[in-house]
Amino acid sequence: MSFRIYSLHLSWSRKDKIIVNRDCHQSVINTLILGDIEPAYIYPQIDNKTNILMGIKIEDAIDTIDKNLDAKAILLTYPTYYGKVYDLKTICNYAHSKGMMVIVDEAHGAHLGLSDKLPMTALEQGADIVVQSTHKTLPSFTQSS
């Protein structure tokens, strides 16, 4: 069982709501279904030239939080699967001000803490729970995820 699934099952009850970026990992969708947890989605920006998902806009995250104040948490992917980063700190601060926990899938960002020339990690930006996976961006075996 992935840590994403484990952390969600430990933290919420059936029929609870969480905010999720729509381009999240499939295991998040499976967990929402298995746990009978209601999602409120934030849709990512798409680069019209390349069709690459560019991450979420701050305004969209804040708007989704404001429309779903009954959500227990917000779960985001940072960086995106294409390496795009966004202002996670602002989202973390806003979610916390509304009483929400912030969970971040940082599977493609395990390397971020290795240099101050890289973007800040999710923990440095205020996330409460961070899931990392060294096999995506660092030298480790696939099984080390």
Label each region the model flagged.
Residues M1-S145:
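Conserved PLP-enzyme active-site core in the AAT-like
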